[in-house]
């Protein structure tokens, strides 16, 4: 179906151009006609007073955790996980995750997010909710090698791939989701790696989120989490690493060499007192860095505009450089760079031939 969005302000490459039009052919941007005729299109949207922007990409979240919003505040990560979140998650089921996910998608779509990358449990229910909501998603079943459900969880993730990869007219992709080095011992990481390699499935993992995680990894293995995962061959697969707060220069060099993409979660890292990821240093080294909210319980909202603002402000303060991350760069992290993080080269930008994931922002 052909669609015309007319009379809009157009945000592209950090600039706004007024009185523009966008022509769509199905799910793709066709062109930007100067004098379009309404009768040439099956659908016409008058965008007067609106600003057209690429849809925002939330590169790391746990959508059903909307149900745990404000449940556990003023705690550091491991205390928060072990004493609040993991016990609460034992009570989840398919129906609860479906409605928790649907609540998240309502919040995301209202806030301009059109794509998300999720790692959680009961992911078939999350996928069904996302399909009904019409949002784009990368899905991973969170895997814990130390859990009694380690093998059944991995099988669930493989079945998720078989059912949902490419579904929803290409809106859904599936990743394998080993939770973190502290929940996934080396032998389990190797098993996940091997299963992913057999099927060409990318990886979504939490890495170097807290100082304690890195210290414990060094104590147990003599390596940082990044170096450990690299030595285990995990980075031979396309990998999205969430957080990467406490990383060394050597870690960053490995990530750049292995094309590991990073989901930067400033709000979550601040709330859980995890620290501030060296986002500026990683970007300067050539690492692709997107933005994520993490789950609503570790952020309290799924607002990507808020994450853009935080990302820009905390790095200005942390580096004493007002140009550390500009507004334009923060927008890139939330759109085109976020799209690259989840495996898209034709998303997060308003260009001919790009996917037409477009939001209209009311400027009145």
How should each PLM-predicted stretch be described?
Residues 231-234, 238, 280-363:
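His/Asp/Glu-enriched, well-ordered alpha-helical/loop segment
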Residues 114-115, 288:
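Short acidic/polar active-site loop segments enriched in Thr and Asp
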Residues 1-39, 50-51:
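N-terminal metal-binding scaffold of metallo-dependent hydrolase/deaminase domains
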Residues 134-136, 193-201, 234-237, 254-263, ...:
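Glycine-enriched alpha-helix->loop->beta-strand junction motifs that scaffold or abut catalytic
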Residues 125-245:
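Metal-coordinating catalytic core of metallo-dependent amide/deamination hydrolases
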Residues 67-99, 106, 133-144, 211-238, ...:
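Active-site gating loops and adjacent loop-to-helix segments of metal-dependent hydrolytic enzymes
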Residues 8, 22, 27, 49, ...:
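Divalent metal-coordination and catalytic microenvironments
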């Amino acid at each position: 179906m052909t669609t015309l969005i007319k009379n809009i302000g157009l945000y592209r490459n950090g600039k706004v151009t007024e009185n523009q039009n966008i022509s769509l052919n199905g799910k793709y941007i066709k062109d930007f006609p100067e004098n379009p005729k309404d009768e040439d299109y099956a659908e016409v949207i008058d965008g007067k007073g609106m600003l057209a922007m690429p849809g925002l990409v939330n590169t790391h979240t746990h959508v059903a955790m909307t149900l745990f919003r404000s449940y556990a505040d003023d705690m550091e990560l491991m205390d928060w996980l072990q004493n609040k979140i993991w016990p609460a998650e034992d009570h989840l089921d398919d129906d609860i995750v479906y409605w928790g996910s649907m609540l998240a998608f309502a919040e995301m779509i209202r806030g301009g997010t059109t794509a998300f990358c999720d790692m959680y449990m009961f992911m078939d229910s999350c996928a069904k909710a996302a399909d009904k909501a019409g949002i784009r998603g990368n899905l991973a079943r969170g895997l814990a090698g130390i859990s009694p459900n380690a093998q059944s969880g991995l099988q669930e993730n493989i079945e998720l791939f078989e059912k949902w990869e490419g579904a929803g007219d290409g809106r859904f992709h599936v990743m394998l989701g080993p939770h973190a080095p502290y929940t996934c011992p080396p032998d389990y990481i190797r098993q996940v790696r091997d299963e992913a390699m057999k099927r060409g499935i990318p990886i979504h993992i939490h890495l170097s989120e807290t100082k304690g995680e890195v210290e414990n990894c060094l104590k147990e293995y003599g390596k940082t989490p990044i170096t450990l995962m690299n030595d285990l061959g995990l980075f031979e697969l396309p990998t999205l690493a969430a957080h990467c707060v406490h990383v060394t220069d050597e870690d960053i060099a490995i990530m750049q060499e292995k094309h590991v993409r990073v989901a930067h979660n400033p709000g979550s890292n601040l709330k859980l007192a995890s620290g501030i990821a060296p986002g500026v240093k990683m970007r300067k080294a050539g690492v692709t860095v997107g933005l994520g909210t993490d789950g609503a319980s570790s952020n309290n909202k799924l607002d990507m505009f808020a994450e853009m603002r935080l990302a820009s402000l905390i790095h200005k303060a942390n580096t004493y450089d007002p140009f550390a991350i500009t507004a334009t760069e923060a927008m890139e992290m939330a759109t085109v760079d976020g799209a690259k993080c989840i495996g898209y080269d034709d998303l997060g930008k308003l260009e001919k031939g790009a996917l037409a994931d477009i939001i209209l922002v009311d400027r009145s």
